[in-house]
Amino acid sequence: MSIESLNAFSMDFFSLKGKTAIVTGGNSGLGQAFAMALAKAGANIFIPSFVKDNGETKEMIEKQGVEVDFMQVGITAEGAPQKIIAACCERFGTVDILVNNAGICKLNKVLDFGRADWDPMIDVNLTAAFELSYEAAKIMIPQKSGKIINICSLFSYLGGQWSPAYSATKHALAGFTKAYCDELGQYNIQVNGIAPGYYATDITLATRSNPETNQRVLDHIPANRWGDTQDLMGAAVFLASPASNYVNGHLLVVDGGYLVR
């Protein structure tokens, strides 16, 4: 260990100034938090989303002194991944960071869970992430740098009732993260994942509003509270920044301790 190496480290290692990040589904929910986090760290943001932005995300991101652009698109549509990467490169010149955040979850009992439930979740949660990463890697390999962050889940570790496809896609996304890391690491591209726990978002409102189910969740979390979206923002900045250049193939769990109980 050299003194020069110790002195070289600074908070600039967490800066994303001049970088460009794609955040799928980045105009709502946890995706909006990821987009805001990277913008606050200095990155320009490109958001492909099925849902058109209502102006809220654009206003918040532009207040950070960076640029943002949107593309209304279904990420599973034929040719969509290629179009997304091409549009980002046309607007910002390159892709430095890809956050595969977009995902869906359908609930049904195992014997009622047919292909109509299964296929869309495989397409959105897994195949779209694979295709976008494939296209982004074509840009990142020649520039000898890049960050791919896959938004996994506690269900990358657990089973989970009523949603076999969700658990299957999140387990697969964790494996995909490690496989891509193994191949792309030689090009100075880091591929990691974030596994959020239970967060206070619109999607979990029904669970939080029911005293019984709300308490059941809290009883499983050592932190004794639901996660706030800001709890995830530091993790996103870390994995997108030079501070994590030697972190590769890792799933960063941000769950208040849920998995240990």
From Swiss-Prot:
This is Uncharacterized oxidoreductase YgcW. It comes from Escherichia coli (strain K12). NADP(+) binds at residues 22-46. One of its GO terms (molecular function) is oxidoreductase activity, acting on the CH-OH group of donors, NAD or NADP as acceptor. Gene3D superfamilies: NAD(P)-binding Rossmann-like Domain. InterPro entries: NAD(P)-bd_dom_sf (IPR036291), Sc_DH/Rdtase_CS (IPR020904), SDR_fam (IPR002347). Belongs to the short-chain dehydrogenases/reductases (SDR) family. The lineage of its organism: Bacteria, Pseudomonadati, Pseudomonadota, Gammaproteobacteria, Enterobacterales. The gene is ygcW. Its EC number is 1.-.-.-.
